[in-house]
């Protein structure tokens, strides 16, 4: 299982339309290919959108990333996102901080 924390800087004035696109297109399309959205948050003062996703393997992610369904909305994502940061993280460490 692979877990990613993704931080997007969204172009000014586009955060609300990004959230709509995310909820209406990205989440359901991701789920169809086994890419689960674990959570999502907005940092409005910084125009940031932070989300966490998990997927079984790099191969499963590639299926999603090369799908026609994803390609159909990718032009819209590019117009919203100014900067992308992606971090692969380990699962199951919560008990270590209790």
Task: Show the residue positions of the predicted features.
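An amphipathic, aromatic/His-enriched active-site/gating alpha helix that lines ligand/cofactor pockets
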Residues: 20-38, 54-90
